[in-house]
Amino acid sequence: MQTLTHGGDWMGYREQFGRDALDFSANVSPLGLPKGVADAITAALPQADRYPDPLCRTLRAALSEAEGLPAEQILCGNGAADLIFRLALAVKPRRALVTAPTFAEYATALETVGCTVERFTLNEANDFAVTEEFLDAIVPGVEIVFLCQPNNPTGQLASPAFVRRAAERCAACGAVLAVDECFLDFLPDGDRWTAKPLLHEDQNLIIFKAFTKLYGMAGVRLGYCLSADAALLEKMRNAGQPWAVSSLAQAAGVAALKETAYVARVRALIAAQKPKLTTGLRALGLRVIEGRANYLLLQGPETLGGQLRQKGVVLRGCANYPGLDASWYRTAVRTGPENERLLKTLQEVLG
């Protein structure tokens, strides 16, 4: 059987148990696909007999307005993961630096091009927050550095000043700084934390973003990246297949950018439910790393995940994250009733 790295394997659960689970393993919007996006996909169906625009011109124009950046600084892909792999193929670095734990696809993409991946282990005693020592690890010879903002699975967020210093260290070493902001838009004050202001002064910076999480579009597959390095974006474009983003995904993205009321509802829900879920988990004796994201990292018995699966609830086991072990789990923050079911099921399991 093929081993899957990530959460969200609803089909695997259905095959095993013959039913669907309440899935907390995928960090997507608990409100589902916005109606306006679903309508846009339906409206785009008559164009399915045509090849999609390989340059995503309409979508990039909409993103240009939304992000306040020239369309020439935007590249779209089949999810952020697609673009992460394209970056590895474009740069072909020999040596890279990532944190541990962090999103697995950075190392996976880098290793496909023979890159040596150095992992900076984050301190559990410090709730896995990234520290100044990480900057000291950015040395000549390191050709690319990945920083996840907020980090997955810890939810920890480095300050804009820290990201600036990381960018400066990378520039001094001739390294690319790749900042993953795929979960940043869940924060009401995400604009305060983004690395976008650095794009105006740093050719070595690239930022990854995605529609997947905030808009509940995981199955549509749509992401994009931002960079002032036109040559790098062109290399990345050439490293991927020409029609990576379907017509339906492009239409969905344009529609999603108009869903400001939906985004406000998602942010309000997470802001209201996350403290309640955190309190409930801690009341059950579980250690919780709260972070700033729409998910929580928690620690409990190594048998916890399997026991919950038997009862129809799925967490993201974190044993395959370097820097964590089988006692760590990640849970999304979902709706009030869903979070209550999680807490009730945990209480049954933990006694």
Where are these regions (language model features)?
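Short loop-beta-helix segment that forms the pyridoxal 5′-phosphate
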Residues: 52, 64-86
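PLP-dependent enzyme catalytic core of the Aspartate aminotransferase-like
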Residues: 161, 310-311, 320-351
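PLP-dependent aminotransferase class I/II
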Residues: 32-34, 55, 204-289
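N-terminal "arm"/small-domain region of PLP-dependent enzymes with the aminotransferase-like
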Residues: 1-50, 141
